[in-house]
Regions:
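N-terminal [4Fe-4S]-dependent radical SAM core
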Residues: 1-31, 36-74
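Conserved AdoMet/S-adenosylmethionine-binding subsite of the radical SAM
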Residues: 58-152
Length: 152
């Protein structure tokens, strides 16, 4: 796994999936065979296959939460914001702390139980849609399709 820390000015980007997207990471270590986000590789400078790299976005600027007022925000539209590196970097938690008092419609998608760490913050978000992937209970099939999610 190739890991790079990259400096960014902002975590927000305009999107057709919502009005804004927040992706604190580029790439994803989950290596799911069915992943729709693998098209993102062409926008990176990586020669590695999708699932073999992750860029950790480091942003010192606070999110301009005024932009998000009454907007639809999709967090982790092309990565998993609770990927294993989130345990170290805590970027998702930092972002959620900024969104707690913002009246926006937040959609968050993950397949990692690390999401449980942030339940204290997620409970405070007024309009939250939390999607958690549970792909299969067949461990052999899971190992073939999805190297990351657990059935425990």
């Amino acid at each position: 796994m190739i890991l790079r820390e990259i400096k960014v000015k902002d975590y927000l980007s305009k999107s057709k999936l919502g009005e804004y997207c927040i992706n604190a990471y580029v790439g994803c270590p989950h290596k799911c065979r069915y992943c729709y986000a693998s098209f993102m590789k062409k926008f990176t400078n990586h020669s590695e296959s999708w699932g073999e790299f992750i860029d950790v976005k480091i942003c010192d600027n606070p999110i301009d939460t005024k932009k998000l007022l009454h907007k639809k925000v999709f967090m982790s539209s092309v990565t998993d914001c609770y990927n294993p590196f989130e345990a170290k970097y805590k970027i998702t938690r930092k972002i959620l702390k900024q969104l707690v008092n913002v009246d926006c419609n937040l959609r968050l998608c993950t397949k990692n139980k690390l999401v449980l760490r942030d339940l204290d913050l997620l409970k405070q978000i007024k309009h939250l849609e939390l999607a958690v992937s549970v792909n299969t209970l067949d461990e052999n099939f899971r190992q073939y399709m999805d190297n990351a999610s657990t059935i425990a």
